[in-house]
Amino acid sequence: MDKLDANVSSKEGFGSVEKVVLLTFLSAVILMAILGNLLVMVAVCRDRQLRKIKTNYFIVSLAFADLLVSVLVMPFGAIELVQDIWVYGEMFCLVRTSLDVLLTTASIFHLCCISLDRYYAICCQPLVYRNKMTPLRIALMLGGCWVIPMFISFLPIMQGWNNIGIVDLIEKRKFNQNSNSTYCVFMVNKPYAITCSVVAFYIPFLLMVLAYYRIYVTAKEHARQIQVLQRAGAPAEGRPQPADQHSTHRMRTETKAAKTLCIIMGCFCLCWAPFFVTNIVDPFIDYTVPGQLWTAFLWLGYINSGLNPFLYAFLNKSFRRAFLIILCCDDERYRRPSILGQTVPCSTTTINGSTHVLRDTVECGGQWESQCHPAASSPLVAAQPIDT
């Protein structure tokens, strides 16, 4: 998100060696973001099991937003930073800035939707999740991730609402004394800084924190319930009751998936929090934050656009397998073994006269799908499969 004079480079400029090092680093960041996000999109498009998981629709849309950042925003910022000049005109400066705000806001909205999807999947019963996350609702959420950011990007920026009261300061900072040229400067007044930051960062961040906290609490409670039922089931039936490894493994898988998404969200916040905190503070201290600091915070946020695909590769088994298949040219060694024809039993546990069905599950696309459908007669939400 190109804010204030975040793109303004040092008044002294860079030496030849510094320019080479800087250009190499920025090029690596851009290339990593392009290839990584393309890999995520191709993986989901080619892998049928990944396409079955509703969360991955948000992940693909997020990858597309990050891909657009790396193609439409970052290269022009890198060129200006290295050359110490903006050569594309004032109108394209406004367009690029609007795209920057739009795509950055869309990214965090996607992460917020992912956290809500995981909340309904893990904290609610399967029927509630199916009723909440219908194809129509998913489509509306995805549409909102792209449409709502337009009201804090293209609309106010093109109308000049962000620079009301600070036009003279903007004109002063646009001028490049070293080359008698201009920079692409984007400064914001106090109302826009507060509104944009609250809508684009602070409200979604609060929702994500609440959602993931509930997921953490629910996952711990589910694990405790499974252990209690397994221990109580053995003496009630008069014979040793083997541990329901499938149910336990399923819960571990869901918990690990939630932790993975928490790490992704945490990296996003670490990358963008310095920028958004400074974005609110700077207008109230007469815009005294150095341009170099803005540039550092801005590119720290850009790095996040290339970071998510690598988090998927290292932390998510299904994505890791899909990436290996693509990179290794469809090597058969990395394909999933077929689960067709497998017989997966259901184990039961009796407590105080009530029968609790612990559904055995098989792994499918990194998620766990039920292979039997008897109804449990107790509040054993932990034993219910999560349809994602």
Curated annotation (Swiss-Prot):
Q: Which cysteines form disulfides? A: C93-C184
Stretches that traverse the bilayer: 20-44, 55-78, 93-117, 134-157, 189-212, 258-283, 291-314
- SUPFAM superfamilies xrefs: Family A G protein-coupled receptor-like
Molecular functions (GO terms): G protein-coupled serotonin receptor activity; serotonin receptor activity
According to the lineage, what is the superkingdom? Answer: Eukaryota
Q: Where in the cell is it found?
A: Cell membrane; Endosome membrane
Its GO CC terms?
endosome membrane; glutamatergic synapse; plasma membrane; postsynapse
Return the InterPro entries for the record. Answer: 5HT4_rcpt, GPCR_Rhodpsn, GPCR_Rhodpsn_7TM
Parts forming coiled coils: none
Q: Which residues bind serotonin?
A: D100, N279
GO annotation, biological process:
adenylate cyclase-activating adrenergic receptor signaling pathway; adenylate cyclase-activating serotonin receptor signaling pathway; chemical synaptic transmission; large intestinal transit; maintenance of gastrointestinal epithelium; mucus secretion; positive regulation of MAPK cascade; regulation of appetite
Q: Say where the protein is mainly found.
A: membrane
**Keywords (A to Z) from UniProt:** Cell membrane, Disulfide bond, Endosome, G-protein coupled receptor, Glycoprotein, Membrane, Receptor, Transducer, Transmembrane, Transmembrane helix
Q: Provide the membrane-side ranges marked Extracellular in the record.
A: 1-19, 79-92, 158-188, 284-290
Which residues does the entry place in the Cytoplasmic compartment? 45-54, 118-133, 213-257, 315-388
Enumerate the SMART domains for this protein.
7TM_GPCR_Srsx
Q: Which residues are glycosylated?
A: N7
Assembly and partners? Interacts (via C-terminus 330-346 AA) with GRK5; this interaction is promoted by 5-HT (serotonin).
Q: What is known of its domains?
A: Specificity for G(s) G alpha proteins is determined by the length of transmembrane regions 5 and 6 (TM5 and TM6).
Purpose: G-protein coupled receptor for 5-hydroxytryptamine (serotonin), a biogenic hormone that functions as a neurotransmitter, a hormone and a mitogen. Ligand binding causes a conformation change that triggers signaling via guanine nucleotide-binding proteins (G proteins) and modulates the activity of downstream effectors. HTR4 is coupled to G(s) G alpha proteins and mediates activation of adenylate cyclase activity.
Entry similarity comment: Belongs to the G-protein coupled receptor 1 family.
Protein name (database record) = 5-hydroxytryptamine receptor 4
| Natural source organism | Cavia porcellus
Encoding gene, per UniProt annotation? HTR4
